[in-house]
């Protein structure tokens, strides 16, 4: 009996020894080079802890917003319901934009329905309305100051 308890204790300690560093690393492990300006993005309304959350950061340039190969950085975080959080080190204080999608099937594509509507959850900084089209850049642009800026976005699922 004593050896079974001892084995269980050592198994638990071994798990904690290996799991704790991994958990600790994700808490403050921000994308980018450490700077004086940090952005924390809290994605709410996550309906399932499956797949990953693609959180993309764009510079203050309307022509680069949602354009291919125009992002400043992207975090692909394991989706956690009901909230997934990620952070970025920003190059400097200024204006930025964020776009998010919930890649539930993990194929690294923003899937659409047969008629072109989003098949996966999505969100933008400032949570602008998106009834029939993508929001204009001016609606998603936000200011990040020196130190830490926190924003919250709410996922929308159309299906």
Question: For the regions a protein language model found, what residue spans apply to each?
Answer:
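A short tyrosine-centered beta-strand micro-motif
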Residues: 93-100
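Bacterial N-terminal signal peptides
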Residues: 8-21
């Amino acid at each position: 009996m004593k050896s079974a308890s001892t084995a269980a204790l050592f198994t638990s300690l071994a798990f904690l020894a290996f799991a704790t560093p991994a958990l600790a690393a994700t808490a403050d492990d921000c994308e980018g080079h450490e700077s004086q300006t940090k952005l924390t993005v809290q994605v709410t309304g996550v309906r399932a802890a499956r797949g990953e959350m693609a959180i993309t950061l764009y510079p203050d340039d309307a022509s680069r917003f949602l354009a291919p190969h125009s992002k400043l950085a992207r975090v692909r975080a394991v989706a956690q319901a009901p909230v997934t959080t990620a952070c970025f080190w920003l190059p400097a204080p200024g204006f930025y934009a964020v776009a998010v999608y919930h890649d539930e099937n993990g194929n690294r594509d923003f899937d659409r329905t047969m008629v072109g509507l989003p098949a996966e959850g999505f969100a933008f900084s400032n949570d602008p309305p998106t009834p029939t089209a993508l929001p204009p850049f001016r609606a998603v642009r936000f200011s990040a100051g020196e130190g830490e800026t926190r924003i919250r976005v709410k996922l929308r699922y159309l299906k």
